[in-house]
Amino acid sequence: MRPQLKKISIHFMVFLLTCVNLVIYLPKEVHASTVELKGLGNISHYNAVVFGNHSAIGGDIEGAIAIQGDMDASGYTVVGAATGGGNIVGERWIDEGYPSLLLSGKMKKSRGESFIVQHGIVVMTKEADLNNILQSYNRIVYKEKSEIDAKFNEFRNIVDQVNRDASQCKTNNPVPKMSYGIGEDMKNPNIYVSSEMTGKSSLEVRDVYLPNVDNKDFIVMYSDATEIAFKNGSILYDTNNVGTATDVVQTSQPYNPHSPFNKLYEKVIWAFPNAKKITTDGYGVVGSVFAPNAVLEAKGGSINGQIFVGELHQRGGFEGHNFQLNWKNWNKHGTGKVKIKKVDTKNIDKRLAGAKFNIVDGNEKVVEKLETDEKGEAISKDLPIGEYKIV
């Protein structure tokens, strides 16, 4: 049988060997509505990706959320920014045919308060909501758990690669009056990077002074600490590029498309590859957090960017505000590889050798031909970032 076309994205250095761990078999799909699901979305689609369990009492996530473990939320709203209301801090969420909630585990509800999916398509397994928590929501698409988990594996590889790349950024020229020895990366002057957040098992983040980023691509805040706390402080920004960060970034004000702070939300990266526990206590974190091994205990405050964590527990009205990392800039110098794994349709543990595939680019040009080896695997050469199909 001719394999179905598969569309993939190559992200920088990617996920190399991961960008697709394609298992060539067709999962069953059941639609509970006539809504057209275009796919499970790429990593830039999600406001939060949780590789374990998620719980919430109050608060919300303004954008889409993906949860690989179980979800237990009360008094909570998903894609709150879909309303476009005046109280939304992040960018408005628009339904483009990708999940507003992607759930691989079970849906639970240990308290009586409401749980609201404001808009969009919920994607989960048929066993996820046995208690009918979403019984009145008719925009649900059911997928096999293996297909959903494959998407999380893709995301995890991307997040790990971001952390590896962040660890390679170094500076020996800190900018005066800025926090944590932030200075230009020695290899890429378009990136600022911290130099005083490593070598500690625990790290407390209080007031943070950030340099102007009008002519920079990113600020990388990298720490190898295992325990991190955001508390008793604010993030201040050198808005006018005068050499002093005096403007407090207002992380609770309604979204303003002309705010000078918007560029910060897409350019600041908090890279915590070794973190096991992160706490926020009423703190407005600016930028995206990459901590796939950490349990994030968020008590009030917000994260104004994407959230990539092992577990997420929201209390005290904590909110995820709908801002995304500028992935296009982060990936612009990257390449990646594609790995294909061919398995038997009736026994996914049986790998098949000799299967032939073509990798086709966006111009419908065959850029490489692959054949699986005795392990049922084939790996492409380095490919530029872009959209590809496997035929």
PLM region spans:
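Sec-dependent N-terminal signal peptides of Gram-positive bacterial secreted proteins and lipoproteins
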Residues: 4-28
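N-terminal, intrinsically disordered, polar/charged segments of Gram-positive cell-envelope systems
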Residues: 31-32, 357
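Solvent-exposed loop/turn and edge beta-strand elements of beta-rich ligand-binding domains
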Residues: 7, 130-133, 144, 148, ...
